[in-house]
Amino acid sequence: MSGRGSFRFVLLLVLLASCSLPRPTVGLAINGTTVQGSREGSYCQTGGCSGVCADSLAPTAPLTALRAPAPVRLDFSTGAEVNQIHGDIWRGDAMNGQPLESFELRGTERSYTSQQMRGGRYYLLVSLGWSRVTDRGDTSVAFLIELTPP
């Protein structure tokens, strides 16, 4: 195979591999405690290889009980390709009525301090926006937290 043919073959392999990249995920920690997230909720992913969207009901998240002082700091962990994190916080087990609080993190911001969360149960729906060379999109994950003051 010639040098030019080898280059094209390698380029084709790189493009095919990049078409199968998974959507980014997000982790959440509060006061050093990892909060378990739900399965992936609604998402859209578009790029040079294909485009796909799926809508679902609001994800059900497992309950994580923890102690944390107010104000509560939410620390997110995710890949560098994520350039937007949007969160809505409801008091209780699910999305009922208007969110108690909403926030937007852009670029490399990965922490948010809630002024509303105190003792009690909270449902968080977190949406990620990302952009890579080969694709872009958004996805969502839910968290369910029971906070107890220290």
Task: Report each predicted region and the residues it spans.
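Short beta-strand segments within Ig-like beta-sandwich modules, predominantly Fibronectin type-III
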Residues: 101-108
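Short acidic/polar inter-strand loop motif in beta-rich domains
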Residues: 130-138
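C-terminal motif of bacterial Sec signal peptides marking the signal peptidase cleavage site
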Residues: 16-18
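Mature extracytoplasmic domains of secretory-pathway proteins
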Residues: 44-46, 51-98
